A protein has these predicted regions:
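Signature aromatic-anchored transmembrane alpha helix within multi-pass, membrane-resident enzymes
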Residues: 1, 45-48, 287, 415-446
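Interfacial juxtamembrane loops and adjacent helix segments
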Residues: 78-133, 145-150
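Perimembrane helix-loop-helix junctions
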Residues: 223-240, 245, 257-291
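Transmembrane-helix motifs of polytopic, lipid-linked glycan transferases
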Residues: 156-182, 221
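Transmembrane alpha-helix segments characteristic
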Residues: 190-192, 240, 245, 285-291, ...
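Hydrophobic/aromatic-rich transmembrane helices and adjacent perimembrane loops
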Residues: 67, 379, 391-423
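Specific aromatic-rich, kink-prone transmembrane helix
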Residues: 143, 171-174, 194, 198, ...
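Membrane-lumen/periplasm interface segments of specific transmembrane helices
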Residues: 268, 272, 278-318, 322, ...
Length: 571
């Protein structure tokens, strides 16, 4: 009986201990779940803050680049891709407009969706067949603008870009989680996101209303899908890669360079592992994406031959021109160093470590700076940068904006590989210093195409809203670049030169003042100060001639802009 009582007591004690352990386990699981939820919320808040930072700069954007106005026109104009089409002008890209008196409504019809034209994707598709770019970005911009018919504002385009920027940041974070290992992988991924988002290139990309932000999203998503396929290749992932390639090529043709290099490297990787089934599946999916683009937008070949500056012929000339090889990459690299800021400094450090590795202390000497899987994703991006720098028609960073998230990932991998050789306190202090420097430079360095000062010019033009207005067209890009300023006036007399009969009929001298826009004549963002002075003298002579026609005695220049000068004539 005593033995039975002891056995009962032991069982009771064991049951109490098991219940206690169960409660403790549940509490631990609950605490882990709470910590995970808090970490997820913190990550989402941080990523949202990066997007909001771009909004801080977007508020300061006061003007439009000519190509941004083409974005609105090609998206929203009803079967008329360029202003030169409105009055039987030359129906070609950047053609010459017929002389005509444009009304304010004409310009609004070009850049804003009108009632009855909302969600008209057939018009958008048609407009893009007459342009030099595929249509996906313009479909999206038209969709956003269709929600606000009759409105022309930077915020429709910037709002779209913010959504695309947020998607890019999220994809970059997920890509970092695929590449980095260990319990701090999420912190390293956030660092890479910040390194990208706080760079001048990223902010310039997010605040430029063109297809490059969408191109960046598709580039990052392609890298993410392939990184996942490296860990666990599946047919579904290959099909998704094919879809992303299809959409990317329908966004901008330079997408094919990184996509081709990345796919070639991955195919070679699979061949080395003798995974022939995956070689066939992956290659078929990727080629299906390319073929789908060719079938759904068959005018791609004509577009690649449609201009003297943006064509396959120019690309071939640039490839064969040996002087391009040091010039193009070095020129673009120099600009990228300034815009990338801290990232460029990290890349220089990695280059220095790689060159002097055998002379460094043992732990750093044995460190692998870039892991093999990270190399497979990022090295094609660096190679694509060089290729684009050689073949691009203009040496502009916008053609390589889409590669920068992968450059940031490359820098992040090398940065943490070096840091991991140091002590914990040193790692913490260096990381904090680098993050602080990133934040400071992000506020100090002004992104491209902010046009700070245009607001003041527009306020001054508003004072002359009742005055007559003349525009010497020059070329259509220059003429289009002044569209936001034209909206201050009821009508604009657009002529080719001062000998125009229409100009002489228009200059009646009825108003006390006249505003004259003189467009083109070689004036644009890359001319030297000496050339600007010479062009200004020619423009002043034209303004004085118009003043004589209208009986005006005072001729003053109001502003010099990228493609034109604004003159005010008074009696």
């Amino acid at each position: 009986m005593a033995g039975q009582r002891i056995s009962v007591l032991q069982r009771a004690r064991m049951q109490r201990e098991m219940r206690k352990e169960s409660r403790t386990g549940k509490m631990r699981n609950s605490m882990k779940q709470t910590e995970q939820r808090m970490k997820t919320r913190w990550i989402l808040v941080f990523l949202a803050m990066l997007v909001c930072f771009c909004g801080w700069w977007a508020v300061r954007k006061e003007g439009f680049f000519a190509d941004e106005l083409y974005s609105y026109g090609l998206s929203n104009s009803d079967y008329a891709p360029f202003l030169s089409w409105y009055y039987n002008g030359e129906r070609a890209y950047s053609g010459t407009s017929a002389e005509h008196i444009y009304s304010r409504e004409d310009f609004m019809s070009y850049v804003a969706v009108q009632e009855g034209q909302r969600f008209d994707y057939a018009s958008v598709y048609y407009n893009q067949t007459q342009d030099v770019h595929p249509p996906v970005f313009y479909f999206l911009l038209h969709t956003v603008c269709s929600l606000f018919p009759g409105s022309f504002t930077k915020w429709t385009g910037l709002g779209l870009n913010f959504a695309l920027f947020g998607g890019t940041i999220a994809a970059l974070y997920a890509l970092g989680m695929e590449i980095f290992e260990g319990e701090n992988s999420w912190k390293k991924s956030l660092f890479v996101c910040a390194l990208y988002a706080f760079s001048g290139e990223a902010i310039s990309n997010a605040t430029m209303i063109r297809m490059y932000m969408l191109l960046t999203l598709f580039t990052t998503v392609l890298a993410l899908l392939l990184a996942k396929a490296l860990r666990r290749p599946t047919l579904v992932r290959y099909l998704l890669i094919g879809i992303v390639i299809y959409l990317g090529m329908l966004t901008q043709y330079f997408y094919v360079i990184y996509a081709f290099l990345l796919c070639a490297v991955y195919d070679f990787y699979l061949m080395l592992r003798r995974e022939w089934k995956h070689v066939v599946q992956f290659s078929a999916a990727a080629l299906a994406g390319v073929g789908g683009m060719m079938l759904t937008f068959p005018c791609w070949l004509a577009q690649l031959h449609s201009q003297s500056t943006v064509s396959l012929d120019t690309t071939t000339d640039n490839i064969l021109n040996l002087s391009q090889y040091p010039k193009g990459p070095l020129e673009l690299t120099g600009w990228s160093i300034v815009e990338f800021g801290v990232g460029a400094g990290i890349m220089a450090l990695l280059l220095l470590v790689a060159l002097t590795k055998r002379f460094l202390p043992g732990k750093l000497r044995q460190t692998v700076l870039i892991a093999p899987h990270a190399k497979l994703i990022t090295i094609p991006a660096l190679a694509a940068f060089i290729v684009i720098a050689v073949i691009s028609p203009y040496k502009s960073l916008r053609y390589v904006y889409h590669l920068q998230p992968l450059e940031a990932l490359f820098c992040g991998c090398g940065f943490f590989a070096v840091l991991d050789t140091l002590g914990q306190n040193a790692r913490k202090k260096i990381t904090q210093a680098v993050c602080a420097l990133m934040l400071v430079l992000a506020f100090v360095l002004t992104p491209e195409r902010m046009y700070i000062g245009n607001r003041k010019v527009n306020e001054e033009l508003e004072q002359y809203s009742d005055a007559q207005c003349v525009s010497l067209i020059g070329d259509m890009t220059a003429f289009t670049s002044e569209l936001p300023e034209y909206l201050h006036f009821k009508e604009i007399c657009a002529v080719q030169d001062t000998s125009s009969t229409l100009l002489r009929e228009y200059c009646t001298g009825e108003s006390d003042s006249m505003v004259v826009f003189i467009c083109g004549r070689g004036l644009w963002q890359f001319v030297t100060p000496g050339e600007v002075e010479q062009i200004t003298q020619e423009n002043q002579a034209s303004a004085e001639e118009i003043a004589r026609l209208g009986g005006y005695t005072s001729v003053e220049m109001l502003d010099t802009q990228e493609f034109s000068q604004i003159w005010v004539l008074k009696k």
